[in-house]
A protein has these predicted regions:
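Acidic (Asp/Glu)-rich catalytic clusters
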Residues: 221, 259-267, 285-303, 356-357, ...
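C-terminal active-site subregion of NodB/CE4 polysaccharide deacetylases
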Residues: 178-246, 252-253, 313-403
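Charged helix-capping and loop-helix junction motifs
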Residues: 283-289, 318-322
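Short, well-structured secondary-structure segments
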Residues: 189-192, 226-230, 244-245, 263, ...
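Bacterial signal peptide processing site
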Residues: 20-22
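Bacterial N-terminal signal peptides that target proteins for export
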Residues: 1-7
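C-terminal motif of bacterial Sec signal peptides marking the signal peptidase cleavage site
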Residues: 15-18
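Primary recognition of N-terminal secretory signal peptides and signal-anchoring hydrophobic helices
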Residues: 24-38, 46-191
Length: 403
């Protein structure tokens, strides 16, 4: 190998010597090493490492019951602290139908309720009412996940009804008419119907033809009448000619025939459901249908007792069961606590009405004619609209509406 390298070197020298007079001399630049620029790090100030103060663990809170506020299930439910049920302010306030909720940096969570402003600030144990602090018997809890308020005491201040359903571990918070005041001396024709169909069964007179039903509602709308529900009684002054359409039993045709007519004319009605029949009788509405109608804002689902007995023949215990069971069932279906009872067959006695008043705010008879608002709200009369009721007879029933 070494001999081959020497021979090759010799041959190269001879070639260069022979061509030296004809070739330009090539000068290769000297090999240079790459320059290395030394960069010194800039002088920096390293911040001192600070250890954040240890965060004290928050007191453990036990999960509470499901809470439904005016039909809305609160996502966080409730918690228990020292035996008191709490809900999150930023979930509870917005769920209330009649309130206006907002959050302000200066005021915190704010609810405008019946003309009064309530607000809750972080780390502030009281409830601020129109700028004045009200100290609650249970403190407001400021936690990393939000501000929690004692729901029972708050509902008491806002006149919101609480209905406990232990078997379903649910608490219903509903703004109902138990503490409302309303204008007296207002004439309200309250019309009693049952079914709306041409496929009659049983007592034919109970079923109004859909075409007649539409004709009657169209007359009301075109002649300046206001169809209202009991939820509207808190502001009766807004209605010049109030009329109430009520339907007993909760038949399927109330959804299939009546509801589309109400939607067409933007009219309101109240349906009194026999709660044991919901979802179990092919002729009565389902829970889903009742929920849809109630949440449309056009229909109010209320109670017609649990299984439609003659209340005057019930024992005291049976009366309590009829009132409570139907109340719980309607709340489970709609998310709202019902506050009106319609007496089956129009049959009630003093005991039935007194016990009914423990659970409801209004009680309706079957017949009796025109109602004028007063303090007597547990024997409210109605006009009976039958299948053979003519339009002229219907007009006579509603003609006196107003003041």
């Amino acid at each position: 190998m070494r001999c081959k390298r020497i021979a090759a070197l010799g041959l190269a020298c001879l070639m260069l010597a022979g061509c030296g007079s004809h070739a330009e001399e090539t000068t290769l630049p000297p090999e240079t090493a790459p320059s290395i620029v030394e960069t010194l790090p800039a002088e920096t100030t390293v911040p001192e490492t600070t250890v954040p103060p240890a965060t004290e663990p928050e007191p453990a809170l036990e999960a509470g019951v499901t809470v439904v506020a005016d039909g809305d299930v609160l996502e966080s439910g409730s918690v228990l602290f020292e035996g008191i049920t709490y809900v999150k302010a930023d979930e509870f306030f917005p769920a209330l139908d009649e309130g206006e909720y907002a959050f302000y940096e200066t005021k915190g969570h704010t609810l405008l309720w019946k003309g009064v402003e309530y607000s809750i600030l972080p780390d502030h144990e009281g409830l601020i009412r129109d700028g004045k602090t009200m100290i609650l018997s249970a403190p407001v809890l400021t936690r990393r996940d939000g501000i929690w308020i004692p729901v029972e005491e708050l509902c008491g201040m806002l006149d919101i009804s609480l209905l406990s359903d232990p078997s379903k571990e649910t608490l219903y918070c509903t703004a109902i008419a138990s503490d409302w005041s309303w204008e007296t001396g207002v004439r309200i024709p309250i019309l009693m119907y049952h079914g709306v169909t041409d496929n009659v069964w049983g007592a034919e007179e109970l079923f109004v033809s859909p075409s007649d039903m539409e004709e009657q509602i169209k007359y009301l709308v075109e002649n300046g009448y206001d169809t209202i529900t009991f939820e509207d009684w808190s502001h009766l002054e807004d209605f010049d000619k109030p009329v109430m359409l009520t339907f007993d039993d909760g038949y399927l045709d109330n959804y299939e025939e009546l509801f589309p007519i109400l939607q067409k004319y933007n009219a309101k009605a109240t349906i009194f459901a026999i709660t044991v029949s919901v979802d179990k009788d092919e002729r009565t509405m389902t829970s889903e249908q009742a929920w849809e109608m109630h949440h449309s804002g056009l229909v109010s689902i209320q109670s017609h007792t649990y299984n439609h007995p003659h209340l005057s023949k019930c024992t005291e215990e049976e009366l309590h069961n009829q009132m409570l069971w139907s109340k719980l069932h309607v709340a489970r279906i709609t998310g709202y606590e019902p506050f009106v009872i319609c007496y089956p067959y129009g049959d009630s006695d003093a005991e039935a009405r007194d016990i009914g008043a423990e659970y409801y705010s209004f009680g309706l008879n079957m017949t009796g004619g025109l109602y004028t608002t007063s303090t007597n709200v547990f024997q409210i009369p109605r006009y009976y609209v039958a299948r053979n009721t003519s339009l002229s007879a219907f007009i006579d029933m509603v003609d006196e509406a107003g003041r």
